[in-house]
Regions:
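Glycine-rich phosphate/cofactor-binding loops in nucleotide/flavin-utilizing enzymes
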Residues: 157-225, 235-236
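Short beta-alpha connecting loops at secondary-structure transitions
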Residues: 97, 128-135, 171-178
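Contiguous mid-protein beta-loop-alpha structural module that forms a pocket-lining wall or clamp
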Residues: 112, 144-151, 156-161, 169
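A conserved active-site cap/scaffold subdomain adjacent to cofactor or substrate pockets
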Residues: 54, 61-65, 76, 105, ...
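Short alpha-helical scaffolding segments that buttress acidic/His motifs in well-ordered protein cores
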Residues: 49, 116, 170-173
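FAD-binding core of flavoproteins
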Residues: 1-60, 198-238, 242-245
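Extended amphipathic alpha-helical segments enriched in small hydrophobics
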Residues: 57-123, 219-257
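C-terminal helix-coil-helix/basic helical segment that borders enzyme active sites and/or dimer interfaces
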Residues: 107-139, 152-153
Length: 258
């Protein structure tokens, strides 16, 4: 920014491990925000902050879709061109399975994008969408890292080159699992949010609750066997993370179905 009052300098620049296009370093922040650019909360500042945070998390799939699509295209092309014992790599069954995992990630991310487009507009108040926002941010970034790892595996020795897309994608996707809330924390918050709603509705069975929850009522039936158990109080945090992962996948599958 050319205005000295709004300029944020970088006093120390770090050597990035990845994401080379983004400057990474120490920024002392001492700025004056113009009156017409300030955010004025209708009630508490907490609600305004949550609205901004959830909107940011809901828009993660837009980044993830292009990332996963590029990895899917590159990996598919490589497996078609690479010849092993006289046959393309893609003819190997385990390779087909790995490619299908990237394709599944792309499908799930596409469903997330459709939901986000309908939901994350500036005209909507997103302060109450913590479960859905955490689901999109955590799962799509996990899918990005998983797709990158698969692409690196399929690329073989070439993937270990510093300038190869597979190796770079592993490093570049990793920070997104950590910042804006580490994914383990977000999965735990998803589980905590659902258990709180279950107590409020006096429902003990996870499947019964998700069958009536707005963003899982269509998809829960596909996972009845896995979800048909009761959630009691005092769940260890490590188990909350696991339950949150399960719930995130059920909710995301509904976005695909819709």
């Amino acid at each position: 920014n050319g205005n000295p009052e709004q300029h944020i300098p970088m006093v120390e620049r770090y050597n990035n491990l990845g994401l080379y296009a983004i400057p990474y370093g120490v920024n002392p922040i001492d700025v004056v925000v113009p009156e017409d650019q300030r955010l004025n909360p209708e009630s508490t500042g907490i609600k305004l902050m949550l609205d901004m945070l959830h909107r940011s998390r809901l828009q993660f799939p837009g980044m993830g879709l292009g990332f996963i699509k590029r990895l899917m295209d590159e990996s598919l092309q490589h497996c078609q061109d690479r010849i092993v014992s006289g046959n393309p790599l893609i003819n190997i069954d385990s390779v087909k399975y790995q490619l299908s995992r990237i394709q599944a990630a792309f499908t799930i991310c596409s469903g997330m994008c459709a939901y986000s487009v309908q939901t994350s507009g500036i005209e909507h108040d997103l302060s109450g969408l913590s479960i859905e926002a955490n689901t999109l941010k955590a799962l799509v970034t996990d899918l990005m890292q998983e797709s990158a790892q698969i692409s690196l595996q399929l690329a073989g020795a070439n993937g270990y080159r510093l300038d190869h897309i597979a190796g770079r994608s592993v490093v570049d996707s990793r920070p997104f699992q950590i910042f804006e809330g580490s994914n383990e924390m977000l999965y735990a918050q998803i589980a905590e949010g659902i258990t709180k709603l279950m107590r409020k509705s006096k429902t003990a069975n996870l499947f019964d609750f998700l069958s009536n929850y707005p963003t899982s009522n269509l998809s829960a039936a596909y996972f009845k066997e896995q979800l048909n158990f009761n959630l009691e109080g005092g769940i260890p945090q490590r188990d909350l993370v696991t339950i949150g992962r399960m719930i995130a996948r059920v909710i995301s599958f509904q976005f695909v179905l819709q």
